[in-house]
Amino acid sequence: MDFKASGTKFKKTGKKVVPAKAFEEIVQTNRDVLKKSAFLSDLLENLQPHLNNIKKIRCVAIGNFKEDFPATYQFALLLEITDYIKSEDERDVVVSLYDPIFTKEEIQYLKSLGSKWLIEEEFSENDAIDYESVLYFLPHAPLDLTENILSSQRPHLWLANNMISHTDRYTKAKLCENYPNLSKLVHYLQTNAPPEVKKAHDVDGFATFIPKRKRKNRNNSSKLKVTPSDIDYDSIAPKFKSCQILTDFDEGKYLKEKPWINSFSDLTLHAIEY
């Protein structure tokens, strides 16, 4: 996780905040900010066609939502989503959460929200055919956790880091080696991406470093290119049939330079098909 548990009080200082108010007041203030944002409007608009199918929200890696500034905003977003489903579909949605760093206070608080709020380390969709019934919310989840869930579950709606930008530090070959399921989905996204996006993320064709003293005697055109052998994506994670981005919030413009700072940086709503 990116955030470590440390104390129970908070004031906004970098990643931490301090409560001059009660936690509920802070969350409500954050929710009021979100309600006025183009970000939330965009998200709810793109969730609207799927509301009838969503029966559960699985939220993992949210962090210490009563202590950390980003996690508090992420928790406020989770509440906005659950309330929106209730207002539109007249039903409560089940919320399944887990993070190993939850404090006793946070666990007690979640239990106080009612029987629809569950703390579950192990999570399994009851019916593989009904995979569209779960909305996954993984704010700032590490790649290992992302790969694990993609491998063990059948997520359809995936609200998490943008799969392309979150993995762009890896070559295609290295991504496939370390995170094969994620690699397959990134391949789908890049295949359907606009030309300028493909070019920006085509990290496999890079020039070999040549010391300055040797460059003097070489023509730029002679620099070697490292190109991995073609990857057989058809043989990787065959359960996946496609992946698309439903919204990246106007290429992240709705997420930047806002009161929530980096709480939602790189957040994207994906749809995975099987």
UniProtKB/Swiss-Prot annotation:
Domain of life per record: Eukaryota
What are the UniProt keywords, alphabetically?
Cytoplasm, Cytoskeleton, Microtubule
Sorted alphabetically, which Pfam families does this protein's record hold? Answer: SRR1
Classification via InterPro entries: SRR1-like, SRR1L
Compartment(s): Cytoplasm, Cytoskeleton
**Which biological process annotations from GO are given for this protein?**
microtubule-based process
One Gene Ontology cellular component term attached to this UniProt record is: nucleus
* Presence of the UniProt keyword Coiled coil in the record: no
Q: What's this protein's family per the entry?
A: Belongs to the SRR1 family.
Note from the entry = Present with 6490 molecules/cell in log phase SD medium.
Q: Which PANTHER family match?
A: SRR1-LIKE PROTEIN (PTHR28626:SF3)
Q: State its role.
A: Involved in microtubule stability and kinetochore function. May be involved in protein N-terminus acetylation and/or proteasome biogenesis.
**Protein name as it appears in the record:** SRR1-like protein BER1
Q: Which organism is it from?
A: Saccharomyces cerevisiae (strain ATCC 204508 / S288c) (Baker's yeast)
